[in-house]
Amino acid sequence: MKLCVTFLLVLVILPSVTGVKSSERTLSGAALRGDRGTCSGRGQECKHDSDCCGHLCCAGITCQFTYIPCK
């Protein structure tokens, strides 16, 4: 039990010692910066082709399947 607590304590303290800001390493920080880490499926909102999953393209404001390659 003491080993587990020590390990967790090291995980909490280590980022502050290395100088890395916690918001740069967490999903909540990604949400604050607007980074999503996931892609949009068919019919979901997009701004660029890279926002869409797989072979979907951003057609207007939603991801759609197209027979021609994305731009």
UniProtKB/Swiss-Prot annotation:
The cysteine framework is XI (C-C-CC-CC-C-C). Residues 20-47 form a propeptide. Keywords: Disulfide bond, Secreted, Signal, Toxin. Residues 1-19 form the signal peptide. GO terms for molecular function: toxin activity. It is found in: Secreted. One of its GO terms (cellular component) is extracellular region. Belongs to the I1 superfamily. This is Conotoxin Tx11.3. Expressed by the venom duct. Disulfide bonds join C39-C53, C46-C58, C52-C63, C57-C70.
